[in-house]
Amino acid sequence: SQPISALFQDHRLPGMKGIADNGKLQLYINDQTAEVAVLDKRSGVIWRSNPEKRDSDTIASGVNKDMLSAQTRINFYNSYGQMSSVNSYTDSVAHGQIALELIDQGIRVSYQFGKEERGIDDLPQKLSKERYEELVAKMDSAGQRAMRLSYTQDKETGVYNRIDGALQGLQLQRTLAAFDAIGYTAEDLARDSEEHGLTYEKPIPRIFAISIEYSLDGDNLLVRVPASSIRYPEEYPVN
């Protein structure tokens, strides 16, 4: 999203931009963290969506500490009926996945939780000796090295098996890059899987979206979550 320009600022709210003023209240936002604040112009009282000194909180830790920086959380179910949750700080703001849009007397903050990441399932689980050699022959030395670390040959069958334990972090990225560099496609992956009696199904990305609208109305701050802004995969129903 485009950076939000400050209409005004206040020394009591460093890092925050004033975006709406209705004569009684002023609305501020930090466009990096999406936290908002409301200043009552008559009393000087400030209300914040998140604690001001949360970084120095000594009680909260882990995900609870992150929740001090979040504005919302989504609970959802997986295919086993187990409930998990994502929050707007850990799963959206921390990855720069927010968009801001000015509305009448306020602002709309749109969050995307999660991202479409490629992983181990985007690499063939098994490759015949011929197919392995065909692919490796097209790769540069870095790609060939990645393959040697990511696949091991079954001496009896000659088949190369993916070493799942090795495919994490940088090694996973290097191996994905090696396949990308030779133009390896999802169709190639489906074909290579089929050759060994394996079915390939692209994993469903666990991506959610939600918007929060903040606006001033007389003496009040109105906070709205438009139902139409809530999006989630069918496989992960939201509670």
What are these regions (language model features)?
Residues 2-3, 177-190, 198-201:
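Intrinsically disordered, low-complexity segments enriched in small residues
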Residues 2-12:
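Short, Gly/Pro- and small/polar-rich lid/capping loops
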Residues 8-9, 89-93, 190-210, 215, ...:
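Short linear interaction motifs
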Residues 13, 22-24, 93-95, 207-211, ...:
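Short alpha-helical segments and helix-capping/turn motifs at coil-helix boundaries
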Residues 15-185:
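Acidic-aromatic substrate-binding/catalytic surfaces of carbohydrate-active enzymes
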Residues 102-109, 201, 208, 223-226:
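Long, leucine/valine-rich, helix-dominated scaffolding and oligomerization segments
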Residues 109-115, 194-202, 227:
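Short beta-strand segments that buttress and anchor functional surface loops
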Residues 203, 224-239:
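Acidic (Asp/Glu-rich), glycine- and aromatic
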